[in-house]
């Protein structure tokens, strides 16, 4: 006859093995879900482009069309979406600035057709944005219930800053 502690140990160990097995199947099932989405991103407007002392700042708005519904499955907890602006200057080899971000938790809201999205300014330490090419990139992280967080980049667009500073829309 086994004691109560031996029986409890057997049950806990068996439960742990079953849990690890289910989590392993969950991680392996990730290979069957597509991570590809079509995204269209473009500059809508440069609202302000100015300088103060030794830094430049700009407010831009973007247009975004994306259908992210294929990314939602039984293992998707949420999507972290963000748009980066990348540029190069003489002082910096590569600068990346987040200009918009959003956390998406529902599949019903995963079809995005937004105009004039604007959240964060582009701030460049130093002077080098005039007539500089900026690359907008849509990025997303798939945050699973269990498994590895994955990062993806899709949809890019480029635009040039004006050759002069401005306070009004360009």
UniProtKB/Swiss-Prot annotation:
Compartments in which it is found: Endoplasmic reticulum membrane
Domain of life of the organism encoding this protein: Eukaryota
UniProt-annotated glycosylation sites, renumbered to this chain: 131
GO biological process terms on file: protein targeting to ER; signal peptide processing
Lumenal face of the membrane: 29-170
Principal subcellular localisation of the protein: endoplasmic reticulum
Cytoplasmic side, ranges: 1-7
One GO location term (cellular component): signal peptidase complex
The keyword Cytoplasm belongs to this UniProt entry's keyword annotation: no
Topology of the protein relative to the lipid bilayer: Single-pass type II membrane protein
UniProt keyword tRNA processing, yes or no: no
Ranges annotated as spanning the membrane: 8-28
UniProt keyword annotations, A-Z: Endoplasmic reticulum, Glycoprotein, Membrane, Signal-anchor, Transmembrane, Transmembrane helix
Stored Pfam families: SPC22 (PF04573)
Annotated InterPro entries: SPC3 (IPR007653)
Biological role stated in the UniProt entry: Essential component of the signal peptidase complex (SPC) which catalyzes the cleavage of N-terminal signal sequences from nascent proteins as they are translocated into the lumen of the endoplasmic reticulum. Essential for the SPC catalytic activity, possibly by stabilizing and positioning the active center of the complex close to the lumenal surface.
Record's subunit section: Component of the signal peptidase complex (SPC) composed of a catalytic subunit sec11 and three accessory subunits spcs1, spcs2 and spcs3. The complex induces a local thinning of the ER membrane which is used to measure the length of the signal peptide (SP) h-region of protein substrates. This ensures the selectivity of the complex towards h-regions shorter than 18-20 amino acids.
Family: Belongs to the SPCS3 family.
Protein name, as recorded: Signal peptidase complex subunit 3
Taxonomic lineage from the root: Eukaryota, Amoebozoa, Evosea, Eumycetozoa, Dictyostelia
Gene name in the database record: spcs3
């Amino acid at each position: 006859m086994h004691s109560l502690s031996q029986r409890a140990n057997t049950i806990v160990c068996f439960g742990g093995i079953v849990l690890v097995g289910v989590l392993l199947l969950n991680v392996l099932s990730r290979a069957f879900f597509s991570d590809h989405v079509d995204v269209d991103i473009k500059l809508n407007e440069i609202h302000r482009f100015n300088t103060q002392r030794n830094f430049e700042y700009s407010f831009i708005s973007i247009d975004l069309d994306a259908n992210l519904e294929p990314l939602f499955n039984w293992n998707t907890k949420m999507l972290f979406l963000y748009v980066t602006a990348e540029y190069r200057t003489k002082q910096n080899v590569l600068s990346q600035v987040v200009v918009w971000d959003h956390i998406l938790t529902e599949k019903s809201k995963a079809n995005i057709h937004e105009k004039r999205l604007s959240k964060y300014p582009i701030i460049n330490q130093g002077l080098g944005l005039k007539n500089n090419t900026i690359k907008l990139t849509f990025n997303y992280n798939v945050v699973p219930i269990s498994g590895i967080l994955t990062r993806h980049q899709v949809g890019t667009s480029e635009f040039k800053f004006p050759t002069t500073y401005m306070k009004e829309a360009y």
